[in-house]
Design a protein with these regions (language model features):
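Solvent-exposed loop and edge beta-strand segments that line ligand/cofactor-binding
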Residues: 62-78, 119-137, 179-196, 232-280, ...
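Beta-strand-rich binding/interaction modules
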Residues: 488-509
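Solvent-exposed beta-strand/loop surfaces of large extracellular or lumenal domains
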Residues: 503-525, 544-553
Length: 694
């Protein structure tokens, strides 16, 4: 028996992971430029640095932060925070942030448990506090991976990085032993089993770096087997019905199931994290069905709770009355969707996944914070007529805020009255942009193929080439691409052309203009081994698109898009922002300006003549998502309504809106990118036409 076990271990240790379709570069190899750099500099000047010291969300009191006197605090908030903070320190020049990073890592490595478990020992009985569980260590492992792989001018020293890799190996071996002993079972804590993909990613990260220990393979198998028996995400995305039977819809006030499976399977953040579960497991299984499950998950999300900004209508949990544009999405769901989409795209090179990543990044992500990144929302919605309570920008707000649209139904409201907002979103929001920077470029074919996936401005350093993308995409219809390389070997340049483009063309400096077909990875023709440089401009042709069939509540409402941008009517509001005093995040509340007309209905938006794109302007220097100065607008025809009961209750009416509610003349209204709004109507009602009103 012992010999058989030993042979099994040897066989496991010699196993290999299935290679990803695209190879991700280490953090620090791709540096933000242009507006993306400006946004990350706002993070460094705002709450991403400040929360290491400020009293906000329990972050600075966490055992994962630098203060040696703090050993408790809000554990999930602290590890969430580090998961975004650490990669940011590799992308933005801030000596103060790097000092905080090093102090935190030193503290973490000095406080391991008796078996080497990060964060200290996990009690081996079944009655333990949430602050001491497997999930409490899964996220910090992702942050430590960023530290260990960080390259470039802001990287730690190699000795410290090696120590972190060693600590991660020991930590995961300790976790494997304890889970195998079921002291406690992996499924005892629901957050861990709902998000086991984080362990898969951590083990695979170590194996990819030569640490092919049998315990890592065993750990992946253990968590997959135990978690999948409780919550089989891939099967659920393939055919699950979240609303049948209705009694299964459990959220915060209704966690009656002892295993919390019903709660976990409806919780929005879990769902967004689980998008990558199948593709991540594919590296172990080699099963094409696993690889394709990310697309299956997105189709499932869009079937049940689609939202216009690429996320879903799920404030905390899937709502019992789904697909309401006034149902918000939790900030954690936004950033976890971005990370899942990036990870899945790297594994299968499906351009639809990167399109979805950009859609979330350019529309939903900016709505999670104020424009100076000094406060965050717990959730936002695509139709939002007040910014207060959990939807406001600030940490530890009291959740006495009900749904934004107070008139739709009482059954779907949920609240945790008089409870300060926990640190999840205040901690987690910081991973959004740094990990998006890392998504812009990959390699394939052992580095011989450079894959430019994103066109937000960046500069990347490869072993034999430097690649940069310039411009202000997505707030422009073009991007410049520059490659400086060491000649001598054959190479390819592969460009992702998004599916939302009507057409695209590549204008090569000193060469021809070639068509680049949308919705594909396009290999640039005519490259030679002796090329030392390459310069080109990628041009996109976009049209205004009116989506008419996406909403049944409100019936007949439309969305208006152009390229990767979703356009909203900016509801006039009165803003109240606290002063930033260096010890706490800002809070921003916005209420409707009752003296300004906002209850509009569009006039025949499907008529091309009724919608006019006004072109792009330069972004505000240093403030990419300046709410006072949107960089683009679409002028639409509309009427101002009066006496519409739905509007009086805070949500848009069904369409068509009867003409008796709008006796005035047709007026021009400006629609702007959702990313540049505080209050907004994105899902818009439509007036009845003359025939309907007859």
């Amino acid at each position: 028996m012992k010999l058989a076990a030993a042979l099994a271990l040897l066989a496991t240790a010699s196993a290999q992971l299935v290679a990803p379709a695209l190879d991700r570069l280490p953090v620090g190899r791709i540096m933000p430029a242009g507006w993306l750099k400006a946004e990350e500099e706002l993070m460094a000047a705002g709450s991403t640095f400040g929360l290491g010291f400020w009293s906000g969300g329990g972050i600075s009191a966490s055992k994962w932060l630098a203060d040696p006197k703090k050993t408790g605090g809000e554990e999930q908030g602290g590890e969430y925070f580090m998961n975004g903070f650490v990669p940011l320190t590799c992308q933005v020049d801030s000596a103060a942030m790097r000092d905080l990073r090093e102090a935190a890592i030193t503290k973490i490595l000095g406080a391991v448990g008796s078996t080497g478990m990060l964060g200290g020992d996990i009690p081996r009985d079944v009655d333990y506090d949430q602050n001491e569980n497997y999930w409490g260590r899964m996220i910090i492992a992702l942050a430590l991976q960023s530290y260990a792989e960080c390259e470039g001018p802001y990287a730690p020293n190699a000795t410290a990085q090696d120590a972190v890799v060693d600590a991660l190996v020991v930590h995961h071996k300790a976790m494997e032993a304890q889970i195998k002993d079921e002291q406690p079972k992996f499924t005892h804590n629901p957050w861990g089993y709902a998000r086991y993909d984080e362990i898969l990613i951590s083990c695979q990260w170590l194996i990819d770096r030569g640490r092919n220990d049998s315990e890592l393979w065993s750990l992946m198998d253990l968590v997959r087997t135990q978690a999948d028996a409780r919550l089989p995400w891939e099967d659920y995305f393939t055919g699950g019905d979240p609303f049948h039977p209705p009694s299964d819809v459990h959220c915060w006030p209704n966690k009656s199931d002892a295993t919390e499976k019903n709660f976990m399977i409806h919780h929005g953040v879990n769902i967004m994290e689980a998008i990558k579960t199948g593709p991540t497991w594919y590296r172990v299984s080699g099963n094409a069905t696993d690889l394709g499950n990310a697309a299956t998950a997105l189709a499932w999300i869009d079937k049940w709770e689609r939202s216009a900004d690429g996320t879903f209508t799920a404030p905390d949990c899937f709502a019992q009355l789904p697909n309401l544009p006034t149902n918000g999405v939790e900030t954690c769901s936004v950033v976890e969707a971005m990370y899942s989409l990036r990870t899945s795209y790297e594994l299968n090179a499906d351009v639809h996944l990167f399109d979805r990543l950009e859609w979330v990044a350019f529309n939903a992500m900016p709505a999670t914070t104020n424009d100076r990144f000094t406060g965050n929302a717990y959730y936002h919605s695509v139709n939002q007529i007040q910014l207060g309570g959990k939807s406001g920008y600030g940490a530890n707000q009291r959740d006495d805020f009900r749904e934004i649209s107070t008139g739709e139904t009482t059954k779907r409201r949920h609240r945790r009255a008089s409870v300060g907002m926990n640190g999840c979103c205040t901690g987690n929001v910081h991973q959004g942009w740094p990990k998006f920077v890392m998504a812009q470029l990959q390699t394939a074919d052992g580095g011989a193929t450079i894959v430019v996936s994103g066109y937000s401005p960046f500069a990347a350093t490869l072993p034999t080439a430097n690649v940069s993308v310039g411009g202000q995409y997505p707030f422009a219809d073009n991007a410049t691409i520059s490659v400086a390389r060491t000649p001598g070997k054959a190479w390819k340049l592969r460009l992702r052309v998004p599916c939302w483009a009507d057409a695209a063309s590549l204008v090569v400096a000193g060469g021809a203009t070639v068509d680049a077909p949308p919705c594909a990875l396009f290999d640039v023709p005519g490259l030679a081994a002796d090329d030392a440089s390459f310069e080109a401009t990628l041009l996109f042709t976009h049209s205004i698109k009116v989506l008419e069939d996406k909403w049944t509540n409100p019936k007949g409402a439309v969305e208006i898009t152009r390229g990767p941008l979703l356009f909203s009517f900016p509801v006039p509001g009165r803003r109240n922002t606290t002063s930033l005093n260096g010890t706490y995040v800002e809070t921003t509340f916005v209420m409707v300006d009752a003296g300004a007309p906002w209850q509009i209905a569009l006039v025949d938006p499907t008529d091309a003549a009724s919608l006019t794109f006004g072109g792009f302007e330069a972004l505000t220097a240093g403030l990419p998502f300046d709410r006072d100065r949107p960089p683009a607008k679409i002028t639409a025809k509309a009427k101002v309504t009066t006496g519409v009961k739905s509007y009086d209750k805070g949500y848009v009416p069904d369409s068509p809106v009867q003409s008796k509610y709008a006796n005035g003349s047709v007026v021009d209204v400006d629609l702007v990118p959702l990313a540049h709004t505080y209050l907004r109507l994105t899902v818009l009602p439509v007036m009845e036409n003359a025939t309907e009103g007859a």
